[in-house]
């Protein structure tokens, strides 16, 4: 239970309200740098496929991935919106603003994530994410 909302067990379907409640908590954890809180959202046997990073299996590599991700970003502002739900799969639109730790430049990023939920936790996290210097033009994808 999170923020007074119970999450589905097994592979029961998720409601929009449940997904929004989870996303609100995830955003708070990312912006607050709560690595343990984020890792606790995943079961021990989780799988993470994040961008070009090799697939990570288990919470120890996941912790490393999240720690490295947050270490590069200062003044992180995150917005996550659930754009689709298919029973136990949540499709998330993710937008981030931050200052790059090494260059000091303002950055912006956009991504799409698919979370496969099990027992109220993120069993599989798949994400595509791109980032550019804030104000830079994004390349248009060829159709």
Report the location of each language-model feature.
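Short hydrophobic alpha-helical module
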Residues: 29, 41, 68-72
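Short, well-ordered alpha-helical segments enriched in acidic and aromatic residues
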Residues: 32-49
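Residues at alpha-helix boundaries and the short loops/turns that link adjacent helices
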Residues: 13, 29-32, 56
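A beta-strand edge to alpha-helix "cap/lid" segment located at domain peripheries
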Residues: 1-14, 18, 63-143
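Amphipathic alpha-helical repeat scaffolds
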Residues: 24-28
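Secondary-structure boundary/capping signal
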Residues: 34, 46, 54, 74-77
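Short solvent-exposed beta->alpha transition segments
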Residues: 47-67
